[in-house]
């Protein structure tokens, strides 16, 4: 019986000529006359056992492909040109892609020009980008490859600070390509992260390119009242859809977003004060009642920082309280802070670096009702007085922007709205031009390079130029409005000394 001899890494395989002749594959057609010669056909780049598996497939139309042998069989099938086996191997690899092997499969697909595997592995990287940064192969991605990944509209990052941490980890392995940092959009980053990058000696150029990462764009949550039942809706920039999350029957509550959950704090139900806090996951729409606060109260002030929800002051029946406490997301124990110097409700609270600032509101007892202008700062585990606001205000809204505080006041006893800037380093207040007037309740949040105000219409205030934009928007019956990103960078004063600790904390929070 005539045979064709193959040599693979010094090992010999003799194959019946009839198998070669009957094969429909081009590789075997080209060597059908080679058996007339005495020398063996040398096959390079093919595993001996993989070639045996291909011969079994050619003879019996059966092949044993596992996750352990799929790559070597696929390489052999590509070189020998056996398309059915190539397809089987590619399907096996795609079925077994995960965050720990997707970069290796991505590189494999490029090496052998396998488009389906390339697309599948790229999709896995895009969906699990924060996890794949732990892969030793991550640092070997080229600059162009990482740029393509991070520029994809569906790349799974929820904040531009996360993108920054991904880039910093890659730059650590590729110090000659620091200019990749220019794919960042600084207006979507926190001041803290921008300062950290500056301390590293990196400069982000002003980008005129459109924002492609949908995940870094602001989510929106709205609570709208109708017949004493308020409906909660959520807008996702990744899906571009509004979805109804649920309902609440509370009044005089406060709300805040932390780790993609909406917390509804205190308030009243059927004219009765409550001390419960409800939490709804904005993705799963699942509700949970978290541990009660220390007392029954409404009209509290809230702020969030570093994974913690802070609740300050409030109204306990008819008396203002100075209680300050916080709850870490995912835990069940409220931690008490020292009480405010002046109890109050309806004030504003905001973080600047590691410090809490509380301002305005109302101090009330059974005998007194005092509208406040004083400002307190919680720093180094104690409250201290700061320069008071220029006027007394019972309704105050405050946001941090570029290390300072911007305050917009509502009206009750006041005759008009005011806009102030508090310069933190100078402990100084200045009054700025106010675009609108005679608005009581509103919602204020910082959105990159502008401050968004939802009042009788939608306003954008640009602090750097002290200019305003006005947009038509129906604001009727809105009880709460907030724009947010899904991850919260720790707010702290980053210095050269604290920079390593800050970056380490961010890496643990964002990339693990």
UniProtKB/Swiss-Prot annotation:
The keyword Repeat applies. Transmembrane segments: none annotated. Kelch repeats lie at residues 216-261, 262-307, 309-354, 356-403, 405-449, 452-498. The keyword Iron-sulfur does not apply. Pfam families: BACK, BTB, Kelch_1. InterPro entries: BACK (IPR011705), BTB/POZ_dom (IPR000210), Kelch-typ_b-propeller (IPR015915), Kelch_1 (IPR006652), SKP1/BTB/POZ_sf (IPR011333). Belongs to the poxviruses Kelch family. This is Kelch repeat protein C2.
